[in-house]
């Protein structure tokens, strides 16, 4: 139904195809938080059960008659609960997933707003700017960081062109996704998030180190040149995120720099070491595009946040009706 509606809208020129915006919204799944598990939650439950079993065993040593039978039943009940949690733990280990939902297996616990979490699906949506009409959506159980590339590919197929500009918020600011946009020859403007770690003095934040593409060097605010040995290093970003390749930049001038403690929290140990990822040039190009198209980017909210404002707040559709996985959830959203 949704695809047919988009085709009709295109036929009547209701879709402009020159400017689109992408965003996501969380829709609650038919799975309670109680029936969602990760390793930490399992560890807490198992530790509690082990403690209770130990208490029961201590009582069992002095119990007799009906009291003994009652305690043995309690131990059996706790043992069965432990086996259940161990089975879920094995599922987590075998699948490599961070969490398991037992009512709707493909739903995941996610942050919805202000650090409030819900077991939900994350619906990626592409909206055309001409009349704020959604042209595409995809029901996922992941966050936004790796979503933009695929949604741009789909938009290119739907619009049958790559001559459009796409607007996204900072949740989509990922180097590998910027590369996909570049490879598709699509102009994407993605908001730039705040730097995760700052220098003790903001004057020495990495944004104030000037990169020279010709020499592949950085110049620090004190005028010193940071260079690389040319080697690429795999940076570990955690169990559930792929490694990224980086080059490291440093200078021996750090040893005698009087501003060192203003520049780096670990200056006395290492001096200042900058890292530049394999995707840095795509992030740099995005920064230039965003800064030179500020008025255009301001349209993002009015384009993409309006449809779900209507759907969720006025129509009350904030949850998935079925608990049969992403495919059935996708049908719910499409209708």
Predicted region positions:
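Anion-binding and metal-coordination hotspots
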Residues: 1-335
């Amino acid at each position: 139904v949704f695809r047919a509606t988009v085709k009709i809208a295109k036929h009547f020129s209701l879709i402009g195809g020159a400017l689109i915006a992408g965003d996501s919204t969380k829709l609650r799944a038919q799975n309670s938080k109680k029936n969602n598990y990760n390793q930490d939650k399992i560890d807490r439950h198992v530790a509690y059960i082990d403690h209770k079993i130990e208490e029961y065993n201590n009582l069992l040593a002095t119990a007799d008659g009906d009291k003994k039978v009652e305690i043995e039943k309690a131990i059996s009940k706790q043992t069965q609960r432990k086996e259940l949690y161990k089975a879920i733990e094995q599922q987590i280990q075998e699948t490599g997933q961070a969490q398991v939902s037992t009512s709707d297996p493909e739903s995941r616990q996610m942050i919805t707003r202000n650090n409030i979490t819900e077991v939900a699906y994350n619906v990626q949506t592409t909206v055309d700017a001409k009349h704020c009409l959604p042209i595409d959506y995809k029901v996922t159980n992941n966050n936004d960081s790796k979503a933009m590339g695929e949604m741009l590919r789909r938009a290119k197929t739907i619009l049958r062109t790559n001559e459009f500009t796409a607007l996204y918020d900072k949740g989509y600011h990922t180097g590998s996704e910027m590369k996909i946009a570049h490879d598709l020859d699509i102009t994407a403007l993605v908001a730039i998030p705040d730097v995760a770690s700052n220098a003790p003095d903001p004057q020495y934040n990495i944004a104030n180190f000037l990169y020279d593409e010709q020499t592949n060097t950085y110049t620090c605010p004190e005028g010193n040149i940071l260079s690389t040995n040319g080697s690429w290093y795999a940076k570990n970003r955690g169990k559930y995120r792929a490694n990224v390749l980086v080059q490291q930049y440093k200078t021996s001038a750090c040893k005698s720099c009087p501003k060192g403690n203003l520049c780096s929290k670990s200056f006395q140990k290492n001096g200042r070491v900058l890292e530049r990822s394999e995707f840095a040039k795509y992030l740099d190009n995005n920064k230039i595009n965003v800064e030179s198209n500020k008025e255009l980017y301001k349209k993002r909210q009015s384009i993409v946040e309006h449809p779900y404002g209507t759907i969720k707040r006025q129509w009350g559709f904030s949850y998935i009706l079925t608990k049969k996985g992403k495919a059935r959830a996708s049908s719910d959203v499409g209708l």
